[in-house]
Amino acid sequence: MAYSCAVQAASPAPLSAPRELTPRGIALGIALALILGAANAYLGLYAGLTVSASIPAAVISMALLRMAGGATILENNLVQAIASAGEAVAAGSIFTFPALIILGHKGPLPYLQVTALSAAGGTMGALLVVFLRRAYIVDDRLPFPEGFACAEVLRAGENRSQMAPLAWGGAIAAGLKAAQDVFGIVPGMISGARWLGGAVIGGSINISGALLGIGYIVGLRIATLVFAGGAFAWMVAIPVLALLHGGGQNPDPMRAASALWSSQVRYLGVGAMLTGGIVTLWRLRKRIFAALRDSLAIVSGSHVQVVAREETDLSPRAIVSAVGLTVPVIFTLCLMLGAGVALSAALALMLALIGFFATAIAGYLTGIVGASNNPVSGVTVIVLLAVAIFLKLAGVESVGVGPRLAILSGAVVCTAAAMAGDSLHDLATGYFVGATPRALEIGVLIGAIAASFVMAPILNLLIAGYGIAGTATSRAGALAAPQAFLIAKVTQAVFRGGLPWTTIASGAMLAALLAAGDVLAERFGSSWRAPIMPVAIGLYLPFGLSVTIFIGALTGGWLGQEKEGGPRLLFAAGMVAGEALMGVATGALVTAGVSLPVL
C-alpha cells in the first residue's frame, strides 16, 4: 500500500560511470563516523536521544571535497552514508551496554564483547534491509523525511539556485536550537496538566524547527495518525489509569501524568508496535518472499538478472555470507558468558531470526518519522521481552546471569534495528539523488564496522569521566542514560516480575482492532485508512513530538501541495538540517566541557 504524503520519491537521475565509492570518500566517511558517533554517544547518554548524522556529514563532506576538487553529489552522498553508520552504532550501544552498569557491572565494559556484538548487529542491520529496500522505498513509497531533507541538502550543493530557501530554513531552526540549548532563553518544550476529579489530563508541545519540517514533509495523513496515537495516550489512557490506580497521590498533575506514561502507557506503544510489525511483515510477505526467492536463485547460480545501476544491490551471496558470520560470533560470546552449547546455539539462531523482524520494523518506522525519531528503544524492548522469556523457559532463572545474557543478546538486535533505520534512510537519500544502492550498502557496512571498534573506549571514557546517575559510577554531572535505565528495568522485571503485561497486551489488542478496521476499509474501497505503525509511534513517543509534527503537517495542508523541489519543501528540509547541525555543535560544546546554557 503506497502512502500519500507531501513528498513522493523521485525517479533516480541516471548517471553514467559516476564517481561514487572513492578512497578519499571512504577515508573521510570513516573519520566522520568516528567523530559523529562519539558525539551522539554522549548526547544519547546525556539526554536519551541522538541526532541523525547524515545531514551534518553531507554538509562537511561538500565543504571539504569541494576544496579538494572533482567531487560529485554521489561521492558526497556516500560520505554521509558511511558517517551516519557511526551514529547508528552509537545509538545501539548506548541503549544497551550501559544497562550492565545499572545492573551492577564493575569495571570498564569489556572491549571484545562490545566490539563483537556491535559489529554483528551493525552487519545485520546494514545488510538485511537490502531485501526490504524496494518494498519500502520504491513500492510503498514511504516518505523518509530526513532522507528527503538530506537529498535536498546535497542537491542544493550542486544547484546554488536552491540554496536560499534551504539556508533560511536552516538558519531559523539552528537559531531556535541555539536559543534553547546554548543560551537557555527559549524553552525546548511547553507542557501542562490538571486534575479533573480523580483523573489527570495533560499534554505538551516541543518547540522544534526540525519536527515542524518533518511534519510538513511526511504530510497530513501520516502526521494525523501519529498525533492520534499520542492523543489517545494522554487524553484517554492516562486519565483512565489515574482514576483506576489513584494518580491523585502525586500532588503535581504533570508529574503524575508523566509517571503514568513512562510506567504504564508507553507499553501500549510496545504492544502496538509488536502487532504492527507482524501485520506489516504479513502484508509485505509476497514482496519479501519474492526478493528472497530471487536472491536464493542467484546464490545457487540458477538465475542471472541484469538490472540498471540505480537498482543494483549487493549480491545475495555476499549478504548471506556476511550475516552468516554473525551467528558463530554470537554463539562464541554466549559460551563465554556461561551459557551451554545448546543454549548458545539456540540464542544465536534466535537472534538472527529476530534480527530480520526488528530491522523490518525499525526500517518501516524510519520511513514514517525519520532516523532521529526512530523509536529504537521500543523495538529493543520487544526483542528483550522475547529473549528474556526464552531464557526463563530455558531454565536461566538467575537474576544475575539471565539479565546479563538478555541485555548482551538484545544489544545485537538493538544495534541492528538502529542500523536498519539508518541504512534505509541512506538508501532513500540515494534513491532521491540517483545513487547506486550497492555502493551505499558497502559504505554503510564499512562505517558500521569501523565505529564498532571504538564504541567500547568511547563508552568507557564517558562513564569514567561523568558516571551514570543512580549507580556506583555517579558523580557531579552524571549522565542520565534514560534509555539504558528503561532496558535495565524491563530486563529485571521479566526475571523478578513487575512488567505491565496487561498494558502490553492491551496495546497489541488495540493495534489488532485497528488492523481489522483497516482491512474492512480496504475491502469496501474506503479512502479512510489507518495503518498501525504511525498510531503505535504516537503511543510510544513523547506527546510533544507528535503535536509539533502534526502542526507542521497542518501547515503544509493549509498551504497546499507543491511540486517536488518547491521552495516550501526546501525550507522544511532546511529546518531539519539546521537543527541537526546545531544539535551536533551543541553536543561538541558539552563534550568539550562548556557549561550550557551560558546565560
Question: Can you describe what each PLM-predicted range is?
Answer:
Residues 2-599:
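Alpha-helical multipass membrane-protein architecture
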